[in-house]
A protein has these predicted regions:
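Non-heme Fe(II)/2-oxoglutarate
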Residues: 1-52
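Phosphate-binding glycine-rich loops and adjacent basic patches that engage nucleotide phosphates
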Residues: 2-19, 59-61, 90-96, 119-121, ...
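Membrane-targeting and insertion segments and their boundary/processing signals
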Residues: 24-28, 67, 117, 131
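Short N-terminal helix-initiation segments at or just after the protein's N-terminus
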Residues: 32-45, 59-60, 98-108, 173-174
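Amphipathic alpha-helical segments that form well-ordered structural scaffolds
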Residues: 49-57, 129
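A short coil-to-beta-strand element that immediately follows conserved catalytic motifs
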Residues: 61-69, 108-109
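Catalytic core of Fe(II)/2-oxoglutarate
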Residues: 71-174
Length: 174
């Protein structure tokens, strides 16, 4: 309980985040969980069809790969205001969110919030099923805290379209 309180208090002074995540790209490349269905999603977001689609929709040239992370936001989970710079971001071109949340109510929070340079909210996007959102980075954004009374989790796969080396195949198992 103390750790959670410290985390929330610290988020008021600097970037804070609290959610469950599974970093799909390194898991795929390192051969963890061979045959796991989530690896098909990693392969899909790195397919020429998806990468070319993302490049066309965003007008961003040079897209060569996509990172992927499965996210699960419980009541109280959030991501504070940030712009995706830093953290190995040098090759990030465009962020994406693929929504897997059904029947979400706006008062449950969890919206992807896009901010202007002063931090004012320009747009809030409700978690939805089968919705793909792109936005160029760096761009100020956050995820609103999920309300304590939300009836289920906010689930999505997020990542970045990048211009660095394409995702390699997982190692062959002997």
């Amino acid at each position: 309980r103390q750790v959670m309180g410290d985390l929330r208090q610290g988020a008021g002074r600097a970037l804070g985040l609290l959610y469950l995540g599974y970093n799909m790209s390194p898991a795929y490349q390192n051969g963890r969980g061979p045959g796991h269905p989530i690896h098909r999603v990693t392969e899909f977001v790195n397919s020429p069809e998806f990468l070319n689609f993302g490049a066309r929709v965003t007008g961003q040239a040079g897209v060569r790969k996509a990172d992927a992370q499965a996210t699960f936001y419980r009541p109280g989970d959030f991501i504070g205001l940030h712009d995706d710079s830093g953290w190995e971001s040098g090759n990030r071109l465009t962020a994406y969110t693929l929504g897997f949340t059904r029947e979400w109510r706006s008062d449950w929070g969890g919206q992807l919030l896009l901010h202007d340079d002063r931090g004012d909210i320009e747009r809030g996007l409700l978690p939805r099923w089968n919705t793909l959102t792109f936005f160029r980075v760096p761009r100020l954004h956050s995820v609103a805290p999920v309300a304590a009374y939300a009836q289920w989790a906010r689930i999505s796969i997020v990542g970045w379209l990048r211009d660095d080396e394409p995702l390699g195949a997982p190692p062959k198992r002997s």
